[in-house]
A protein has these predicted regions:
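C-terminal motif of bacterial Sec signal peptides marking the signal peptidase cleavage site
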Residues: 30-32
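Sec-dependent N-terminal signal peptides
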Residues: 21-27
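Metal-dependent polysaccharide deacetylase catalytic core of the NodB/CE4 family, i.e.
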Residues: 35-36, 50-54, 80-93, 120, ...
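Bacterial N-terminal signal peptides that target proteins for export
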Residues: 10-21
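Catalytic grooves of carbohydrate-active enzymes
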Residues: 51-109, 219-220
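N-terminal regions that are enriched for targeting/export leaders
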Residues: 113-122
């Protein structure tokens, strides 16, 4: 067996020490410790054909270090899995530099760029990165075109409130699709699904929030094969109903100890 080099031992020690200090600080704030993404199984797709996927948030509030992102990308490369990561508004909620760090890191490791349409077709196999963006930050996404082109990246845009988007921004979405990116649904009004179902019923949730968000995109020519839950909020009952209408669902994982994730176990 090859002996570990001293430099690697030192880096591992520093990483472990840094994680310990971060957990102690988190405890003083009353929040859970951030887990190593490389040990967060729910964000890795291993080709098992699942219909409900889970991604981890890249936004600043998640406080993911580059070392933690490296751990996730390294695992995907080593095990032939697809790591799922999402974000929202470039610059406002997530630094463009962090987006580039992930995309560049995937390219350097030889990871394929996988969309949720690929998952729906059964072709989303690893090693790979499934990067997605939620909500309506279309101009910000559009400004990432050169970055994506530089690394040959393909991503998925889960768009909410599409019926309220007009003119130039719809043209931007068309161009993003023409570039090879996936356009998917994210509800009409970005409401919490389980709360809506509890108050109004399942039929109303499908009628008011889910199906129109799919149909309005289809009317503009997009083959919509995936749906992302706002806030990742879901139940098995809602999953079953939605999977009658669309093949792939995306929730989220909260990678902190003591914090309950909506991701299926």
């Amino acid at each position: 067996m090859r002996a570990r080099d001293d430099g690697q031992d030192r880096r591992d020690h520093e990483r472990s020490h840094g994680a310990t200090l971060a957990c102690l600080f988190a405890a003083t704030l009353g929040v859970g410790c951030l887990r190593d993404l490389g040990d967060t199984d729910s964000i890795f797709y291993d080709g098992d054909g699942r219909s409900v996927h889970c991604a981890v948030d890249l936004d600043r509030k998640s406080d993911l270090s580059h070392a933690n992102l490296d751990a996730a990308l390294d695992r995907a490369a080593a095990r032939g899995e697809v790591v799922e990561i999402y974000a929202h508004n470039p610059e406002r909620t997530v630094a463009v530099a962090d987006i580039e760090y992930v995309v560049k890191g995937a390219a350097e490791r030889g990871l394929a760029f996988v969309t949720y349409a690929d998952f729906a077709r059964g072709s989303g196999t690893g090693p790979g990165l499934a990067l997605s963006f939620d909500d309506t930050s279309i101009p910000g996404w559009y400004d990432l075109r050169s970055l994506f082109d530089r690394y040959g990246a393909r991503v998925t845009f889960f768009i909410s409130r599409y019926a309220q988007i007009y003119g130039n921004e719809r043209a931007m979405v068309k161009q993003l699709a023409a570039d090879g990116h996936d356009i998917a649904a994210h509800t009409v009004n970005h409401l919490n699904g389980p709360s809506y179902v509890e108050e109004h019923g399942m039929t109303a949730y499908l009628r008011d929030e889910v199906l129109p968000s799919i149909e309005v995109l289809q009317a503009d020519g997009y083959e919509v094969t995936a749906f992302a839950y706002p806030f990742g909020a879901r139940t098995e009952e809602i999953d079953r109903e939605l999977l009658e209408h669309i093949p792939v669902l995306r929730s989220v994982t909260f990678p902190r100890s003591g914090v309950v994730s909506p991701c299926p176990e």
